[in-house]
From Swiss-Prot:
This is Protein Smg. Disulfide bonds: none annotated. It holds the Pfam family DUF494. It comes from Buchnera aphidicola subsp. Schizaphis graminum (strain Sg). InterPro entries: Smg.
Length: 157
């Protein structure tokens, strides 16, 4: 499922290509590439629920509030997100890339993934995918993209 999400993001979204709204054709195309039907369905369902999640969280939390808070993770969240991942989320909050709202969306969507543990590289992709899909997050998406993809270029001698 996660591989399907990454493929969709790299192929259709990040490359600037038009993504087909026709889920039947998209599903067929992904199957032809070699993805399993089960993984395709889960990935598309995950993206659909991202939309629902955004609406629910943004309607329940005042967007003007962007206080830094200490997030208390549940045992399940701690199991899925190791200390490096939780530290990275805090780091993104401190850089004002994540707000309270986007942090909660990211954690909720991570918990919905059908993987037992998320590593730091997977987390970076998940955050990119989510920020790209949230209206109004274009600036922080670009900031994160520059941080992740241009950081290594700047430190190479």
């Amino acid at each position: 499922m996660f591989e399907v999400l990454i493929y969709l993001f790299e192929t259709y979204v990040h490359s600037g290509s038009e993504i087909s709204i026709d889920y039947k054709n998209l599903t067929s195309d992904l199957s032809d590439i070699g993805f399993r039907s089960k993984d395709i369905y889960k990935a598309l369902h995950w993206l659909k629920n991202l939309s629902c999640c955004k609406k629910n969280i943004f309607s329940s939390i005042n967007l003007s509030l962007n206080h830094t808070t200490n997030r208390i993770y549940t045992k399940k969240e701690e199991f899925k997100l190791n200390s490096d991942c939780r530290g990275f989320i805090l780091f993104l909050e401190e850089l004002e890339i994540l707000t309270l709202n986007t942090r909660e969306i990211i954690i909720e969507r991570i918990m919905a993934l059908d993987i037992s543990h998320v590593n730091i590289e997977d987390l970076k992709w998940i955050v990119l995918i989510i920020l790209f899909n949230i209206p109004g997050c274009e600036v922080v998406y670009r900031k994160l993209e520059n941080l992740l993809f241009n950081f290594k270029k700047e430190i190479v001698h």
